[in-house]
């Protein structure tokens, strides 16, 4: 990461730097390109008059955000121009994981292919049955440790840059047995961390619960409708304003 001059002093449009899981770029029928105007990061960017750098992947936790912020050269390039940073993760952290995350993520590397398919199918059978009693993918204290490591590293390179974090979304996914008992402990841990470090929070549940629980999202029961994306964008703009970001309309 770099501590070079910010966009305000170079004449470039500021960048909204978003670290995210798939909730930020999936719609009601599947994944979308990072520049799709219907997903919340681009709705927010349009309202602010900013560019957007969306760095994410399906299944990412707050631990992956740390790795992306410190190892992905896109984040190094975006940070000097960033007007604000959003941590749009924590949902995967709070979902049940019958296998330890490291083992689950190694399934993709199993060889030969027939064995990988067998292991994946087996895990797909086990996951919804064991999810109601499984631990979260990341313990809440580990989630906030990675959030703080990332926030501190970003603040070291860009002192005082506005940062907004997120509380977990909700789901009705049969693949997880509709279980989400890890959400409340994760919410409590992130809330305490955010209060300590004065980080505004966006409660994704508040934005999307009606759509998700009403069955109006993606059929997988996890990802959102475009109406939910618009609701997230609205709350994200409020969180950014709380962090000190001025919207384009209010600045004129």
Swiss-Prot record:
Gene this chain is encoded by: octT
Question: What EC number(s) are associated with this protein in UniProt?
Answer: 2.3.1.273
Species, as recorded: Mycolicibacterium smegmatis (strain ATCC 700084 / mc(2)155) (Mycobacterium smegmatis)
| One Gene Ontology MF term | diglucosylglycerate octanoyltransferase activity
What family is this protein classified in?
A: Belongs to the OctT acyltransferase family.
* Subunit composition and interactions: Homotetramer.
Q: What is this protein called?
A: Diglucosylglycerate octanoyltransferase
Q: What does this protein do?
A: Sugar octanoyltransferase likely involved in the biosynthesis of mycobacterial methylglucose lipopolysaccharide (MGLP). Catalyzes the transfer of an octanoyl group from octanoyl-CoA to the C6 OH of the second glucose in diglucosylglycerate (DGG). DGG is the preferred acceptor, but to a lesser extent, GG (glucosylglycerate) can also be used as substrate. DGG and GG are the two earliest intermediates in MGLP biosynthesis.
- Tell me the leader sequence span: none
The UniProt keywords, alphabetically, are: Acyltransferase, Transferase
Q: Note the superkingdom of the native organism.
A: Bacteria
This enzyme catalyses: (2R)-2-O-[alpha-D-glucopyranosyl-(1->6)-alpha-D-glucopyranosyl]-glycerate + octanoyl-CoA = (2R)-2-O-[6-O-octanoyl-alpha-D-glucopyranosyl-(1->6)-alpha-D-glucopyranosyl]-glycerate + CoA
* Alphabetized InterPro entries for the sequence: OctT (IPR050023), SGNH_hydro_sf (IPR036514)
Q: Key word Transferase present in the record?
A: yes
